[in-house]
Swiss-Prot record:
Residues 321-362, 385-427, 472-492, 568-644, 668-726 are annotated as: Disordered. Pfam families: Peptidase_S21. This is Capsid scaffolding protein. It comes from Psittacid herpesvirus 1 (isolate Amazon parrot/-/97-0001/1997) (PsHV-1). The record marks 257-258, 697-698 as: Cleavage. HAMAP family: HSV_SCAF. The gene is UL26. SUPFAM superfamilies: Herpes virus serine proteinase, assemblin. Region of interaction between pPR and pAP is called Amino conserved domain (ACD). The region of interaction with major capsid protein is called carboxyl conserved domain (CCD). GO terms for cellular component: host cell cytoplasm; host cell nucleus.
Amino acid sequence: MVVAEQLEDVFVGGYLVIYASQDGAGEEYRLPKEVVARALPVEPGRVPVNINHDASCRVGSVISIVDVEKGLFFLGVVSGSLALAMFKYVARDLFRADDGDSPGGGAESETRSDEALPANTLSEREKFLYLLSNVLPSLSLSSARLADGYSPADDFFAHVALCELGKRDGTIAIYGSSPPEVLDAFSGLDDAAKRELARSAEEWTTSSRREEPVDEAMVSECLLRKFMNNAFLMDRGEYLRARRHLADVRRPKYLQAAETTCLSSANPRSSGKAAFSCEARGLDEAGAGAIGRAPESGMAASADQHAQDGIKIRLERSRSQIGPGAMSSVSQPAAAPYSGAMADSAAQVPSAQPPRIPCPPTGQTEMIYVPLGTYNDLVVSAAQARRGEDRRQQLSAPPPQHAQQIVQRETGINSSSPALAPAGRGSYASASHIMHQPAFQTQQPCWPQQQQYVQAPCGGHGIGYYGQAVSRRGGSSGDGAPTTRSTGAPGAGGLSMFGMQHAGPQTHFTAPLHGLPTGFPAHGSFLHAPGYLGAMPPIQVYAPQPQQHPPSLDTRIEALLAALEKERASEQGAAEGPQQSLVAGQNKKKALLKRSMEHQREEEEDDESAPEAPYFPGEAAASCKRQAKRQRAAAEGEEQVAPSFSDLIQGLAALHKDVAEMKASVAGIGAPQASQPTPVAQPEHEEPKQAPATVDASSSKKLKDSRRAAEKRRAADEFARIMSTE
């Protein structure tokens, strides 16, 4: 590509240093704000602008450098003669932006190389700005090395280099045809700094100063050296995007952010090689066409549209330009590699993705921008479709080996043979239950000859594991036997087998079933396959029940007292008003709190005292106590802290003792004491020794329960002794 004449100078601007982001470059590249302030201002034109820090390749000058709150910002000028050296290596059709419907557009424009381009193409200056923005997108400042005792002077700034990626973060270069076009790209730059830079640029322009022509041989050498040094640079676009964000550059006009270097919609080279196609992202053209709309005129996006954040996707020019036979040649999606009997039905199950539309011929493609959010939705949809295929592959797997072993061990029936397969929960699915089950309905429409397989809800009947997958065939079954269609199903019909259920009209199914009687073909076609599973009676499974112990007398008395107390409390609450009920509830809460505190205090006291006889785990007495305690808690609704039955017995025993002492004292005062007869020795009868009582010493709470039971027994023995003396 050759430029007829030298272009006018263009402007460049950007941050040379961002004060808050200097850690990544290293300490030797750190520039403190106070040091920079002593080196300013800079005389316009004194600091040169070169390529890759090559002093012999000067291409412009620095107009002004200002110190703002965010960092050190500069505005410079680049010589228009640099375009002559760069355009020598640019293809002629790189910047073509023809209108496909215009006389100069489309395929005809490829043969008109000597004629003038249409009026809607980019100007030479805009092409030059695109080249600079994409070939030299960054800035790098060269300054004097800071040392102890060094004071910045007029020669502190050596030069500003245009490069691929600078050492410092946020040093992005923005090019423009005028100073406002450069400065407006930085949203974080304050108005005062913009006015100062614009005034300096106006003074530079009014002075009619122009940059000297560049050395084309030196420029070519520098650009080749730059290419060789940066050929292995990884993630260049990510670095530039991060630096634009750090520099508050929101909408760069000439910075090409896409992964293709071509701006043309009718470029044959870009459509075949450099164009970013849908297949590179795992999507097809139909997925992109669902969100993008081809312009009616087929014209490529303008320079302003290229500045938006998005992803280029190759689309058809328009449906009217594809031709009548293109849509008829739509290829069906390839079936997933299913295994077993599921492979035949997988090809007829509708895919989650839309039909695949073939790519249009070369020269009839165009690039559009797709919003990142919509593109992410496409990626998620493709991932969900892949997960659905993986799920269907998992469902097509045979039942696990351990399931067959469990079935054979529990029932004595080999599930691999053509006998009855066991159902879940220890029973067989009856024919009457299966035939009266309603079909499982799905929200997706049932297309003709294409049915949806869905997961059936878990119930009490049905096969207890996933068996062989269900497939649908036409013609004959897998073993060559003629297939038939069952019409005796009620309603719409449904298939419920092996944990799967099919919704839809009467449909031809062929499936290898484990649950058929002996002699029935292994492969068959029926609408309600589980209806054949009702020949065997249900298998009863008996689970061991825990041993029940009758509650003791104390437990029944305490439960009766608690029930009477609750009934009395409910009657009082019904008789009282709402306010009195509220007060009673509060008093009850206080009483429960006080009782729990006393219970906790008693537990602490019980922890200090040892039980009378230890309890060894495994004895029957402890299980009886635990069972009685659980029954008492279930009957009362809450744990009883201190029963009142033992207190009544102790009080009654003390009363009888006092009465006996009073009688003895009265008899001693009123009558003389009689001589006591000598006791006659009676033969002692040895009573059978009782087994020592045991208590549960596993916790303080159990110790407390044992202590209470011992107190009750002592009180009962004392009461019996008193009653016997009377």
